[in-house]
Amino acid sequence: MIKLDFLTWKNNHSSNPHVVFNGDNMDVLKKLHAMYDKQVSCIYIDPPYNNGEKYTYYSDALSHENWLKQMKTVLTELKEFLKEDGSIWISIDDGEMHYLKVLCDSVFGRKSFVATVIWQQRNTRENRKAFSNNHEYILVYSPDPELFKKRRNLLPVTEDVLARYQNPDNDPRGPWQSVTVNVQAGHAVASQFYEIVAPNGKVHTPPNGRCWIYNQDRMEQEIAKGNIWFGSDGNGVPRAKKFLKDRAPGVVPETLWLSSFVGTNKDAKTHLQALKIYNKDIFDTPKPETLIGQIIEISTNENELVMDAFLGSGTTISAAHKLNRKYIGIESEPQTCEYVMQRMEQVVAGETGGISKKVNWAGGGEVQFVI
């Protein structure tokens, strides 16, 4: 770990940032504009949710108006750092989510909205309330959503998706899955209504209100090519074969992120406790590295710049470091920065929690702390 004052860091390290600033986020951001405006590919923030709770390191109980005012100030400042194809991801819960959405529409522009991700942040039932609240939100905005769409990364194909591809007929083209060849008939033409005779003689017609996806000539061509499956007995309802070799190398991110894939608050606490640096003063609602890692993998490539202006327990920079991204973290509390410093010492040494096994993390690199 390297401790520096701002001027020394600016003169010697700012071109390749792996840095944490201890200071008020607005003060720090104003100092960084000249160096990093329109240079950041991904901003993730986990701001106070304004839910009235008193947490270990801060009180989350501003008036609604003051919270919105502070958020507007910070978001307006952060907006200037984003590349045109970059994105900002903002965690929030039900209490202020809809107000924050309207505020973000105002700051970034309604056309800059990309998605609302729903994260299953707990998988146990809360019995003390009228409803068990098991989710939070992540609002996603980009200066240019179309450019973001072109540059965003697909997620890896999961084992359960790969398991859908089989090869029951030993097709030399390899594993495949079957999909329906009938569609809603709302805009159908006459050539999409006809009989299909299966190899073993059974006649098939489209279900009521539906039509075949191809006209008869095209369907006969697909059958001749072996692209239509009639079941193991040759009489089943026709379905198209889609081969694993032809599918995209990944999957488009969805807006529902289940805990089984990206973890929970409890998983994050378990990870932090395993580091043995937080004692009893554990962070109340930390985010898991698997969640932040997925955000970073979708929105950035290696050596691109990630920013977090509400650094907290340091999960964003820990994930970014393991994924070989540059990063800027800002945290106002000196004690919290001490915790983050100890955490990053373990990351550099090759700690094995969080996303380490997934990305084959073995340690390395350095982190600068500017105080």
Model region roles, listed by residue range:
Residues 236-240, 312, 360-368:
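A glycine-rich phosphate-binding loop feature that marks nucleotide/adenosyl-phosphate handling sites
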Residues 10-31, 345-371:
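S-adenosyl-L-methionine
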Residues 136-138, 193, 324-327, 366:
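Extracellular structured ligand-interaction cores
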Residues 21, 84, 310-312, 363:
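Short glycine/serine/threonine-biased micro-segments
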Residues 1-305, 337:
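Class I S-adenosyl-L-methionine
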Residues 64-68, 97, 285-358:
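Conserved S-adenosyl-L-methionine
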